[in-house]
């Protein structure tokens, strides 16, 4: 029997380990790759061509929505994507479905439930969405909820996820949220700090955001 090839993408390494162990214990599926950020995820798709991708929405570097956008542009078969999310904003859900997500599961969830939907989507085309929350308990840090809110707002105002300024803008909002005084030193502190994190220059950060 041909096994369903699954990739798992989440920046919560403990959760990834638990999911990998559970999925590999199933007779009809196997984990062929794991990633902890969006860039690693795109490399997995390029190299391994999974049947199903279990993908978290909020991740460092490139978030789940941007990953979906880039996968659509790749010259590779698009895997069936099950999105994991700790929040349920309708606008983000709708955007993800438009970009090709097959299914949404709300954290915390039951691993048996996830496995059943891996089986379901592996034989179906993309384009449907349901949301579920069940008994698997993994606590999401407060920063995750903040990132979710920021992502929702940026997508709502129409900033494309694939442009560089999107990444810098998300980082800037998060930094100002945690230290409001940064608003008084945007060019002297905020932009240089973002530039340092992403190995670029403050002027490039400013141009990208503007």
UniProtKB/Swiss-Prot annotation:
Name of the featured protein: Stage 0 sporulation protein A
Swiss-Prot/TrEMBL keywords: Activator, Calcium, Cytoplasm, DNA-binding, Metal-binding, Phosphoprotein, Repressor, Sporulation, Transcription, Transcription regulation, Two-component regulatory system
Annotated positions binding Ca(2+): 10-11, 56
Superkingdom assignment: Bacteria
Cell compartment(s), UniProt: Cytoplasm
Species whose genome carries this gene: Niallia circulans
Residues that bear 4-aspartylphosphate: 56
Keyword Transcription regulation: yes
DNA-binding region boundaries: 192-210
Pfam families associated with the record: Response_reg, Spo0A_C
Cellular component aspect of the GO annotation: cytoplasm
A molecular-function term among this protein's GO annotations: calcium ion binding
Entry function: May play the central regulatory role in sporulation. It may be an element of the effector pathway responsible for the activation of sporulation genes in response to nutritional stress. Spo0A may act in concert with Spo0H (a sigma factor) to control the expression of some genes that are critical to the sporulation process. Repressor of abrB, activator of the spoIIa operon. Binds the DNA sequence 5'-TGNCGAA-3' (0A box).
Gene: spo0A
